[in-house]
C-alpha cells in the first residue's frame, strides 16, 4: 500500500479510536461479529461467554459505541455487521445480512474467516455493484469500474453518522463526481485499493494498535 493510502488508514484508525469504535475494545469485536453472522439477535450473556468477560464488562464496552443496534428485548442486532436491512447486502454461509457501509463489506470476510457475496446499489445511479470477497482478497467485482467513497471524520461521537453513512459504492468514478463535489474532502478508490486500505485498519481494530506509520 502506498504512503498516501497508509496515511489515510492511519487517519481513519485515529478517528475511530476517538469515536468509541472497536479499536478501544478489540476483545469484543470479532466475537460479536461472529455471533451476529449467525443471523439471530445476540444476548449480552452470549458475548460474555464468548469473550470470557462478565456481563457488566460487556455492557460497558457496548455502551462505548452509541451506534450499537438493539431489538425490543435488548439483544444486539447490529454493530457494523447488522441483521437490519441497509443498502449493503452481505451474504455469508447462506445467511442474508447487511453492513453499515461499503468498506465493511470488504473487511468483514477477513474478520469472520468466511467468503461473502455482496450486492449494493451505486449511490448515484442505483446500478447494482456485486462483489465476491474472500478473507484474503476480492475475487470478483461487477462492474469492474466500481469505486468506494472514503471520508476521514475527526473523532466523531457517532462513527456511523460521520463515516459509515458517507462510504458508498459507485459504479464508476464518473458516477461519483457529483457526490465528490458535495463532499470535497472525500475521495473515491477502486474496490481493490479500498480493500487494501481496509487491511491495516482491520488489524488495528482487532489489536487496538494504530497502523505502522502513525505518529
UniProtKB/Swiss-Prot annotation:
Its EC number is 4.99.1.2. InterPro entries: MerB, MerB_HTH_dom, MerB_lyase_sf, WH_DNA-bd_sf. It comes from the Bacteria. This is Alkylmercury lyase. The gene is merB. Pfam families: HTH_15, MerB. The keyword Lyase applies. It is an enzyme of class 4 (lyase). It catalyses: an alkylmercury + H(+) = an alkane + Hg(2+). Keywords: Lyase, Mercuric resistance, Mercury.
Amino acid at each position: 500500500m502506498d504512503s498516501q493510502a497508509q496515511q489515510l488508514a492511519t487517519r481513519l484508525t485515529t478517528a475511530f479510536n476517538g469515536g468509541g469504535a472497536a479499536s478501544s475494545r478489540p476483545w469484543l469485536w470479532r466475537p460479536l461479529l461472529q455471533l451476529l453472522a449467525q443471523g439471530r439477535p445476540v444476548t449480552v450473556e452470549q458475548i460474555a461467554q464468548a469473550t470470557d468477560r462478565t456481563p457488566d464488562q460487556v455492557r460497558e464496552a457496548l455502551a462505548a459505541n452509541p451506534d450499537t443496534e438493539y431489538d425490543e428485548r435488548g439483544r444486539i442486532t447490529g454493530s457494523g455487521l447488522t441483521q437490519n436491512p441497509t443498502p449493503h447486502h452481505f451474504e455469508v454461509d447462506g445467511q442474508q445480512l447487511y453492513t453499515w457501509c461499503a468498506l465493511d463489506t470488504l473487511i468483514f470476510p477477513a474478520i469472520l474467516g468466511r467468503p461473502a457475496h455482496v450486492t449494493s446499489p451505486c449511490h448515484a445511479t442505483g446500478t447494482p455493484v456485486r462483489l465476491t470477497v474472500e478473507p484474503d482478497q476480492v475475487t470478483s467485482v461487477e462492474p469492474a469500474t466500481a469505486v468506494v467513497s472514503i471520508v476521514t471524520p475527526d473523532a466523531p461521537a457517532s462513527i456511523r453518522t460521520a463515516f459509515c453513512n458517507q462510504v458508498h459504492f459507485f459504479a464508476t468514478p464518473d458516477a461519483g463526481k457529483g457526490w465528490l463535489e458535495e463532499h470535497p474532502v472525500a475521495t473515491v478508490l477502486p474496490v481493490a485499493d479500498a480493500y487494501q486500505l481496509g487491511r491495516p485498519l482491520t488489524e488495528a481494530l482487532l489489536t487496538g494498535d494504530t497502523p505502522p506509520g502513525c505518529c
